[in-house]
Structure formats: C-alpha cells, structure tokens
Regions:
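FIC/Doc superfamily catalytic core
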Residues: 1-224
Length: 224
C-alpha cells in the first residue's frame, strides 16, 4: 500500500487548513452529530446557530480545537498520552470529567451489531499501539489507516472513539505528508456497513483497502 501523496508537512498542513471546516463537518456526521456544512462554518467562525443543541455546538468547537492541536504541535509523540489528550479535546463538556481522557471502565454497546468490545487495559493499549507503529515494512499511510481502525474497534473511550481515531491517524498522515483521511457524506453508509463487518470479524483488510481507495484527500504537486 503505497503513499498516495508525498508532501512536506507544511504542504499537508496547508491542505488541512484549506479544507478544515469540511473535515470537521464530515467527522462530526460520522459520529452521529447531525449538522450541516453551513452550520459547521458558522460555529467554526464563532457565530451563533439557532436550533442546534448545545452539545452539537460544543462538539464542533471541540473538533476545531483538536484539529488545531494536531496541526500546531509537530513534535508530540504518537503515544497513549496523545490519544488521551485528543480525547480530552474532542469530548470536553460532553462526557463526565471522570471519563475525560481516560480509558473506559464500563461496558459499551455498538449500534447495528451484537458484538461487544473487550474492556481496555492501559498496558495492552500501549503495547498494541507500539506494535502498530513499529511496522517498518509498511508505509505511513497504511500504518495510519490500521491505527485508525484499531482505535475504532478497541472502543477504549466511553465516547468519541471515531473522532479520536481519525484525528490520531491524521496526525500521522500530516506529519509524514501523506494527505488527509476523510470520509465523504455519500460514502458514510458504505463505511458503516464495512465497519460493522470489521467489528464482528476483526479482519481489517476490506475496510482498510476501501479507505485507501476512496477516503484520502491531498494535492498533486507539479514537477515544474
């Protein structure tokens, strides 16, 4: 699985900033936060949107702050601490303080399937993440997608796992000039169908390839 894009970090950050509202809008809807693109733009710009719940407005602002965090902090490690920090940013005021930036201690149910994720154990999470990162034979794009899917299936937090997964993966993508993982609105039903299958089987091959084929954004640079 080759890198689709070979950008500098500066170029990749430019791509992200240029399309940031679109990425936030799609990410929010992927997590079931029903907002329109214009509403997302207004919230991002600090405006007021009538008719939206407070939680939806908070969720959009949290995604804004989390994106700023990954774009402005090149030197942060791809580790458990960063996972927890991203969760703090994305879920601030949306989960109880005792759950913010901490792995869950209660069971969770997954919509659309009877499958249930196992309880996360901090030492196992750290070991599994390190193993995924240290795959020298794979490209950064493939590693980022695998880590994103692992976070989603692991369900280590009480809420917001897909948001955390995409942000953490995109931190890896951006730092290595590989583009941006973003799932379009029209592709989200297919994504969820494949995600449920992945949850139930643990086999990421089909979903990983589909994300690679359909859901990586970037720019082609001219050689001139």
């Amino acid at each position: 699985m080759k890198n689709k894009f070979n950008l500098t970090r500066e170029q990749n950050v430019f791509v992200a900033k240029r399309n940031i509202v679109d990425y936030i809008w799609k990410s929010a809807n992927l997590e079931g936060i029903g907002v329109t693109y214009p509403e997302t733009q207004v919230i991002y710009d600090g405006g007021i949107v009538n008719g939206l719940t407070v939680d939806k407005i908070i969720a959009i602002n949290n995604l804004k702050y989390a994106w700023q965090f990954i774009l402005e902090n090149e030197d942060i490690e791809y580790d458990y601490k960063t996972l927890c920090q991203i969760h703090k940013l994305t879920c601030d005021k949306l989960v109880l303080d005792q759950n913010l930036g901490r792995i869950r201690s209660t069971p969770v149910n997954i919509g659309g399937t009877k499958w249930k994720p196992e309880f996360p154990i901090e030492s196992q999470i750290k070991e599994e993440l390190e193993g995924l990162l240290n795959q020298s034979e794979k490209t950064k794009t493939e590693i980022a997608i695998e880590i994103m899917l692992w976070i989603m299936r692991r369900q280590m937090f009480i809420d917001g796992n897909k948001r955390v997964a995409m942000l953490f993966a995109n931190k890896i993508m951006i730092d290595n000039g590989c583009g941006i993982i973003t799932i379009s609105q029209e592709n989200q039903p297919i994504f969820f169908e494949k995600l449920i299958k992945f949850y139930e089987t643990g086999d990421n091959a089909d979903l990983k390839q589909w994300i690679y084929d359909t859901s990586i954004d970037g720019i082609e640079l001219s050689n001139n």
